[in-house]
């Protein structure tokens, strides 16, 4: 889905700083840290609801670790791809480092 929308995989899924499901790069150079969540259905709030504050902190930590390796860090954002059964929802800019 993301590759069809001109996103390119910028990196593998993990580093010493922690795990990020996908690190993609938009055509404009923005790095997109993507968390993919799956649930068989949307009971109990669905897949997107499982990205709580602790998970966001771990993703921000991993992204910070990744960005430190770059001479000039590009703009970045955090997206969530939530899969509930057959329904896929892409939440662009689902949260930011200030959350």
Each predicted region: which residue ranges?
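Domain-level recognition of nuclease-like catalytic cores that cleave nucleotide substrates
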Residues: 68-99
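Short beta-strand or tight-loop elements
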Residues: 16-20, 76
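Conserved beta-strand positions that form and line the central face of beta-propeller blades
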Residues: 2, 50, 90
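Conserved catalytic cores of phosphodiester-cleaving nucleases, focusing on short active-site segments
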Residues: 20-24, 28-47, 51, 59
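Active-site donor-binding loop signature of nucleotide-sugar glycosyltransferases
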Residues: 9, 36-38, 93
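A structural micro-motif at secondary-structure boundaries
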Residues: 8, 15-17, 26-27
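Short, charged, amphipathic alpha-helix that recurs within catalytic cores of restriction-modification
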Residues: 49-70, 74-77
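Acidic-basic catalytic patches of nuclease active cores, encompassing PD-(D/E)XK
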Residues: 1-12
């Amino acid at each position: 889905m993301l590759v069809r929308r001109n996103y390119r995989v910028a990196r593998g899924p993990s580093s010493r700083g922690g795990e990020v499901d996908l690190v993609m790069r938009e055509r404009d150079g923005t790095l997109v840290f993507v968390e993919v969540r799956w649930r068989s259905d949307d009971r109990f709030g669905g897949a997107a609801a499982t990205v709580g504050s602790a998970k966001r902190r771990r993703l921000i930590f991993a992204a910070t670790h990744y960005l430190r390796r770059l001479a000039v860090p590009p703009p970045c954002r955090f997206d969530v791809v939530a899969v509930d059964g057959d329904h896929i929802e892409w939440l662009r800019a689902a949260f930011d480092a200030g959350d």
